[in-house]
Amino acid sequence: MDVSDPTAVDALYEKTAAEYGRLDALFNNAGAFMASTPIGNVDWDDWRRVLGVNLDGAFLMARGAFRMMRDQRPQGGRIINNGSISAHAPRVNSVAYTTSKHAITGLTKSITLDGRAHDIACSQIDIGNAETPMTEPMKAGIPQPDGSVMREPVMDVRHVADAVRYIVNLPLDAYVQFMTVMATKMPYLGRG
């Protein structure tokens, strides 16, 4: 499914409402990236593709979940956005991905405020180097801020699932606004 397609997202929520009657949690985790590219060489189509999935898609999925959680009885639910470590510390030559993940922080904060009246809690989980196909190149080596190429450690993606499960299982009168889960030895502050 293309999360950046409003029609497809609306159809997903219509189907969810018809089949299940309610929605208690959304893990907003779709993501796209592009090859390491300095800003001066970023192609507009690549920029739009990354922002389309990472920001437009996150907005559309969150909006659909918010509407369903607001309109169901009893009201309420949880939206968990994947913000990434890049929401705090960018990688070199990653302007599209970094911009999209910084924007997720603003989206999370806005949903948090808008959701209070409807018992909708919104959290952001910032994940660093969970082992997925997207992080496969990290094991071989990726560019660092000092110009070197370094292998980066990854962690089992199950640790992310455990963190999401923890957030989802909290009662709606409590929430985690931001959580960071990352490989213990990954470069982070200063990206080196």
Give the ranges of each region predicted by the language model.
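Substrate-binding pocket helix/loop in short-chain dehydrogenase/reductase
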Residues: 37-39, 46-48
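Residue(s) in the substrate-gating loop at a strand-loop-helix junction
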Residues: 84
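Alpha-helical segment proximal to the catalytic Tyr-Lys
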Residues: 67, 113-116
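Active-site helix of classical SDR
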Residues: 62, 100
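Active-site loop immediately N-terminal to the catalytic Tyr-X3-Lys motif
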Residues: 40, 89-95, 152
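C-terminal helical subdomain
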Residues: 124-125, 143-189
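The beta1-alpha1 cofactor-binding region of Rossmann-like NAD(H)/NADP(H)-dependent oxidoreductases
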Residues: 1-12, 44
